């Protein structure tokens, strides 16, 4: 009997996140011949916001989805560790963190607070600033510059403290 797994994301098909979903799908296909995957690479194309993936997977509309840790951080504040600038000094330090007891703790909290199963925490790189006004070279360059960020209270406070006019997307 064939099993269908519906997978959702919030990036265009060519993004690194969507490419990762393809790799995940191929791994499933290699392990079992009776699993077929269906993708919705970008739920925003269907009028859904990225944070809705949590509810869509919880409610069974999708079986698998990826989401930024920022969207879970209100109920699991330990995830804010990924949003504090300069706290994690290297990629290796991040890997050591997410491959140990920390991931087990977060996994248990995701299960308890969201009724979801955490498959993994992955490295999504580092944040950079860009804008169409002027280069940011000093702290003064941040003053009043509009900056959009994820739905994350820590981001709003942090960017506002730097002088940005921060707003959530």
Where are these regions (language model features)?
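Contiguous mixed-secondary-structure segments that line small-molecule binding/active-site clefts
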Residues: 26, 63, 68-167
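Short, well-ordered beta-strand elements
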Residues: 1-17, 21-25, 35-41, 143-148
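Short helix-initiation/N-cap motifs at beta->coil->alpha
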Residues: 40-55, 134, 151-154, 167-169
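Sec/Tat-exported extracytoplasmic proteins
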Residues: 31-32, 61
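A short glycine-centered flexible hinge/capping loop motif at secondary-structure junctions
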Residues: 33-36, 57
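Periplasmic binding protein-like
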Residues: 50-68
């Amino acid at each position: 009997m064939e099993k269908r797994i519906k997978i959702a994301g919030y990036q265009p098909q060519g993004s690194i996140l969507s490419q990762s979903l393809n790799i995940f799908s191929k791994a499933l296909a290699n392990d079992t011949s009776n699993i077929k995957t269906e993708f919705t690479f970008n739920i925003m194309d269907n009028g859904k916001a990225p944070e809705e993936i949590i509810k869509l997977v919880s409610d069974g509309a999708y079986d698998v989805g990826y989401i930024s840790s920022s969207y879970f951080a209100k109920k699991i504040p330990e995830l804010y560790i990924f949003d504090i600038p300069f706290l994690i000094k290297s990629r290796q330090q991040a890997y050591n963190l997410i491959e140990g007891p920390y991931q087990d703790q977060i996994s248990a909290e995701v299960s308890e607070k969201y009724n979801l199963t955490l498959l993994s925490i992955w490295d999504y790189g580092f944040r950079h600033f860009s804008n169409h006004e002027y280069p940011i070279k000093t702290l003064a360059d941040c003053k009043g510059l509009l900056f959009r960020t994820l739905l994350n209270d820590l981001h709003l406070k942090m960017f506002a403290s730097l002088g940005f006019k921060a707003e959530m997307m």
